[in-house]
C-alpha cells in the first residue's frame, strides 16, 4: 500500500469515526452510530501503521496535513459547507509541510 493511499484512507476513516460520535452527541442520532464509528477509528489506527516511515512521530506529523485537507473535503461533500479561502490557504500550508516532512532528505 502506498503512503499516500494509506494517509487518505486513514483520514477518511478517522473523520468518519469522529463524525459518528459528533452525530450521536451533537445531532441527536442513535447510539448505534458508535459501533461503525469505533470500527472506523480502529481502521484509522491500522492504516497509519502501513505508511513508509521509520518513526511513528514523523508518520503522524506528515499525516496531519492530509487529515486537514480531507476534513475540508468532508466539510464540503458531506456537510454541504464550501471551504472559504482561509480554509484552503491553511490546508495548502499544511500540505506543504507534509511534503517537506515526507520528501526531505534523511541522513
UniProtKB/Swiss-Prot annotation:
Chief place of localization: membrane
Domain of life: Bacteria
Keyword terms, alphabetized: Cell inner membrane, Cell membrane, Membrane, Transmembrane, Transmembrane helix
SUPFAM superfamilies linked: Multidrug resistance efflux transporter EmrE (SSF103481)
Entry's localization field: Cell inner membrane
TM annotation in the entry: 4-24, 31-51, 59-79, 85-105
Organism name: Methylobacterium nodulans (strain LMG 21967 / CNCM I-2342 / ORS 2060)
Similarity field: Belongs to the UPF0060 family.
PANTHER family (UniProt xref): UPF0060 MEMBRANE PROTEIN YNFA
Pfam families in alphabetical order: UPF0060
Name the UniProt record assigns to this protein: UPF0060 membrane protein Mnod_6500
A Gene Ontology cellular-component term: plasma membrane
Membrane topology, from the record: Multi-pass membrane protein
Entry keyword annotation includes Nucleotide-binding: no
Amino acid at each position: 500500500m502506498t503512503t499516500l493511499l494509506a494517509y487518505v484512507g486513514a483520514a477518511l476513516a478517522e473523520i468518519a469515526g469522529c463524525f459518528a460520535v459528533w452525530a450521536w452527541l451533537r445531532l441527536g442520532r442513535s447510539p448505534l452510530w458508535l459501533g461503525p464509528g469505533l470500527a472506523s477509528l480502529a481502521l484509522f489506527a491500522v492504516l497509519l501503521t502501513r505508511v513508509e516511515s521509520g518513526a511513528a512521530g514523523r508518520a503522524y506529523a506528515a499525516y496531519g496535513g492530509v487529515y486537514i485537507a480531507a476534513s475540508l473535503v468532508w466539510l464540503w461533500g458531506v456537510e454541504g459547507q464550501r471551504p472559504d479561502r482561509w480554509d484552503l490557504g491553511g490546508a495548502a500550508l499544511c500540505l506543504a509541510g507534509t511534503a517537506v516532512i515526507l520528501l526531505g532528505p534523511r541522513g
